[in-house]
Curated annotation (Swiss-Prot):
Keyword Plastid included in the entry's annotation: no
Keyword annotations: ATP-binding, Cell membrane, Membrane, Nucleotide-binding, Transmembrane, Transmembrane helix, Transport
Lineage: Bacteria, Pseudomonadati, Pseudomonadota, Alphaproteobacteria, Rickettsiales
Function summary: Provides the rickettsial cell with host ATP in exchange for rickettsial ADP. This is an obligate exchange system. This energy acquiring activity is an important component of rickettsial parasitism.
The organism of origin for this protein: Rickettsia conorii (strain ATCC VR-613 / Malish 7)
One GO molecular-function entry: ATP:ADP antiporter activity
Membrane topology term: Multi-pass membrane protein
Record's subcellular location: Cell membrane
Family: Belongs to the ADP/ATP translocase tlc family.
PANTHER family on file: ADP,ATP CARRIER PROTEIN 1 (PTHR31187:SF1), PTHR31187
Domain of life: Bacteria
Protein name, UniProt field: ADP,ATP carrier protein 3
């Protein structure tokens, strides 16, 4: 048996591998990530609660393919242009500030006056009757402000988290520090999901946080939705401003005198390396290593998109209005945050003790197991119902899907993100900066958009198709892409080990 002092040192090494002298940098970085992930959790729930009850879960595939993906491409071009003329600090303020301004405009101007901006239902119904194959595009046009909010909420994940925050972290941490810092950063940051879920539940439950049945009937109107939405958006904007202030503090007062990180001036100078848009794209295409990182992101995005569509369709059946949907997603966020923090504690030690390959393989393995369970439950729901009698099968299907989502995303946030970010570190600063911009923004959304393309093509050709009717085809696609993901991780590991030598 170990002496108490050594035992507690071992526990500290497992739970908190951050040294005291590193806290000056770690604490503001962790708080910044907490604020950014709080916004991510809240925005993810709000965007779905707006579009799914009003237009149907099938609309998500059209939004991701026809609106989100082009927006990502446009943003990537703008980002490369900005990076050639401004340093990273100012780019961060411009981008995050633009997001926060839009969220305020949506909550206080666009959403409360949506009846003025949106076309009337009679005209929309006539158009759908005349052009049934284009009914989903017509629905997007009928609720265009919701679609715009969906785009900005999706871009928050791709741009502010994957590109801005992690690129900043990659510039100031080397590989050895990343192994200790990244999992713990994620653990602290994911507390933001728990806080976001609690905020959503509070404002969507009227005056009671726990019992959603006390929700007043008046809240089922668009006015009630606005009453719920405005304070949530105000908190989101406040969290964004705090993140910007923390970023300022890190750049101005911490990086300039820290002996544990790269020199801030050198980083800024290198990040302004001139590179055209075409040259950036060529750089990524000609780099096999960057291509493999992109394939990781594409596989994850496609698989999550394939599973989430049928799950969100089931949620709409149980919670057909916006406020009930927000309430459910708030509770989902709470459990997601708890699971993520737990996985972060486990993941931190897996990454440090078992290495990159095992850590990178655990996410596809977790997703394959839970995803197959969900598909089997949906496909054989009638047979399962015969075994359980009067049990609420719709509720059970939603819970199985929620468990799948929570476990697969927890492993993604704790292990996938950390291993993916570590894969960038051995690269040159030029390839890391410009290549990451293209891979993170375009790659992230291309994966989801590829899954969306498969689904939307079916919905266009067969207007009466639903997720229930195409579930078997989604299962086949799921199995093929999962196999490709696992193969790609093994190949990428060989190149990563070589670069780290």
């Amino acid at each position: 048996m170990l002496p108490p002092k050594i035992f507690f040192e071992k526990v500290k090494e497992i739970m908190w591998p951050i040294e005291r002298k590193e806290l000056k940098l770690f604490i503001p970085m962790a708080l910044m990530m907490l604020c950014i992930l709080f916004n991510f959790g809240a925005l993810r729930s709000i965007k779905d609660s707006l579009v799914v009850p009003s237009m149907g879960a099938e609309i998500i595939s059209f939004l991701k393919l026809w609106l989100v993906l082009p927006s990502c491409v446009i943003f990537t071009v703008l980002y490369v242009k900005l990076s050639n003329n401004l340093n990273f600090e100012y780019i961060f303020y411009i981008i995050v500030g633009s997001f926060l301004l839009f969220f305020l405009l949506f909550a206080y101007i666009i959403y409360p006056n949506q009846d003025i901006y949106h076309p009337n239902d009679e005209m929309i119904n006539k158009l759908i009757a005349s052009y049934p194959n284009f009914k989903w595009f017509i629905k997007i046009g009928s609720q265009w402000s919701y679609a715009l909010m969906y785009i900005f909420a999706e871009l928050w994940s791709a741009v502010v988290i994957n590109l801005m925050f992690w690129q900043f972290a990659n510039h100031i941490f080397d590989t050895s520090k990343a192994k200790r810092f990244y999992p713990v950063l994620g653990m602290v940051g994911n507390i933001g999901l728990i806080i976001a879920g609690s905020v959503l539940v509070f404002f969507s439950s009227g005056q009671d946080v726990i019992d959603s049945e006390l929700l007043p009937d008046s809240f089922n109107s668009s006015a009630g939705n606005a009453i719920m939405l405005q304070p949530i958006m105000s908190i989101i904007v406040t969290a964004g401003i705090i993140a910007m202030l923390l970023f300022r503090i890190i750049n101005r007062f911490i990086l300039t005198d820290s002996i544990n990180v790269l020199d801030a001036k050198k980083v800024t100078a290198k990040m302004k390396t001139k590179l055209s848009v075409i040259e950036s794209i060529k750089l990524v295409i000609h780099s096999k290593y960057i291509g493999r990182i992109a394939l990781l992101i594409i596989c994850y995005g496609l698989l999550i998109n394939i599973v989430e569509g049928p799950w969100k369709a089931k949620i709409k059946e149980l919670h057909p209005n916006t406020i009930d949907y927000v309430n459910f997603m708030g509770r989902f966020n709470i459990w997601m945050g708890i699971s993520c923090v737990t996985f972060m504690i486990i993941g931190s030690n897996i990454l440090r003790r078992l290495g990159w390959l095992i850590s990178a393989l655990l996410t596809p393995i977790m997703l394959s197991i839970t995803g197959l369970m969900f598909f089997i439950f949906i496909i054989f729901i009638e047979e399962i119902g015969e075994c359980f009698g009067d049990f609420n099968l719709l509720y059970a299907a939603i819970i199985v899907g929620a468990i799948q989502n929570i476990l697969s995303k927890s492993s993604k946030y704790s292990l996938f993100d950390s291993t993916k970010e570590m894969a960038y570190i051995p690269l040159s600063l030029e390839l890391r900066t410009k290549g990451k911009a293209a891979v993170e923004v375009i790659g992230t959304k291309f994966g989801k958009s590829l899954g969306a393309f498969i689904q939307s093509l079916i919905f266009i050709i067969i207007p009466t198709a639903t997720f229930d009717s195409i579930i078997i085809y989604l299962l086949i696609t799921f199995i093929v892409m999962m196999s490709l993901w696992i193969w790609n991780v093994i190949k990428l590991n060989k190149e990563y080990v070589e670069l780290c030598k």
